Amino acid sequence: MRTIRFNNNRHISSSPLLRTEGGREASVSNTSGDKIPKGKFSFLLLFFLLFLGSCSSDFLDNKPTDAVDSGLVPVPSNAERIFNGAWYNLFEYGTTYANIGYRALMCLDDMMADDVVSRPMYGFNSSYQFNDVVMPSDGRTTFAWYLMYKTIDNCNTAISIQATGDDDTPEFRHAQGQALAVRAFCYLHLAQHYQFTYLKDKNALCVPLYTEPTNPNTKPKGKATLEEIYTQIINDLNRAKGLLDGYVRPNDKSKYKPNTDVVNGLLARTYLLTGQWDEAAKAALEAAKGYTLMTDAKNYMGFNDISNTEWIWGHPQSVSQSDASYNFYYLDVVEPDSYNSFMADPHFKDTFTEGDIRLELFQWMREGYLGYRKFRIRSDQTGDIVIMRSAEMYLIAAESLARKGQLGEAVKPLNTLRNARGLADYDLTGKKQEQVIDEILMERRRELWGEGFGITDVLRTQRPVVRVALTEDEAAKEYDCWQQNGTYKKYHPEGHWFTSFPDGTKFVPNSIYYLYSIPEKETNANTNLK
């Protein structure tokens, strides 16, 4: 493993009353599970100027300077740099080795759901046991909250800039459109994690809604309803779509910058969550255009390259800027120095059909765990991060059409994906609507394993987490398990070992254990949240 260095790690509260600063310039060894030193809490003024000055306009090509440029002001010529700073925060900000950027939250969300078995190692064991983000005092709870609101505030700064005359350039409009898309992305995350699904109760209170940059005089807000938040998300995305019209990303390394395909993908996710089936299917199919599906299992093995033809949106990594790559140490089951935390439920493998190219990814390994060799860190210890790809869009279109009752149309995008994975068309003969929807949802689980959709799909579909322990007969079997020195050793299989909530009760739909909590330091600072 490598030593990583966290730069400018400042917590930014959604409440202007609370500003905490910790971990700046903390160099640590990654051979232990110790938390990065946090330093003292302090009030920050003009925090977006302080943070954003560290991000150069050639972000993701060269390592950002550690210098703080207090002269970076919110003017049109700085809009792109401000967006880049927001993006850098979203994916590179970290508080511990297991909390580095948005990819850590994606790991958390899958560990809380059905199909990942936690190998008891450093990382996400507490997530598997529903024992971190549900607790207001937990460090990961704090990390998740501030990661989103700091990014939102930085986006608000870029969005608030006014330009006229010669300052109103295409580059400025594109930067604002990208900031709007990322703000919508952040609020979509918050809406899915801090309240039950929109289709359960759109009037339920969720989180504060800030659309202007905060300052020490900003009045803390209370919770907005889900309907208010989703209305803002859709408005932001429609504005972004207009501003990004005609924008073309120059190369794959620029895939972190939203274009209209990304915006359509975010609209598809949003419409799916709000039950707008026609709009969801239309936006999803539009987003998928031009992103060719993989047809070879080798393209899955690694899943670390932003040039993958399926990837619509991703976060590239380089040797000089790669803190986010540390998340691969939890997902990679082959790398000898990895934690190998994410293993597959053996029952999950049983849902795959012979001929499916994804079956090649499974391998019994380690102490009897079933590895799923989807994610590999590269030899230079980096790995690009996928955020959105065309396979997800085909699944959104299929599910939306099926929920509308158009089963014949629904299986068309489903079969497009199945055929690419080596499978025949889904047989619709005699199938009822519920059966088709269930098959599409199962295909989502097979296709998107490890990509951060686990617990949000549980919440969206209002079902319980399902974890089934191995039976006596299943556990008595022996398998030749691959060892990281290249040899094989016989072990009994390992499956789910945590199959109820921490209080001993059974998994149920719409449980508070599936939701993130607001940090207690936030509710203490902003009494409007109580």
Model features per residue range: what roles?
Residues 55-106, 352, 426, 430, ...:
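Membrane-proximal, proline-rich intrinsically disordered regions
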Residues 279-391, 423-424, 437-439, 447, ...:
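Hydrophobic-face positions in mid-chain alpha helices that act as interaction patches
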Residues 18-22, 34, 39:
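Glycine-biased, low-complexity coil/linker segments
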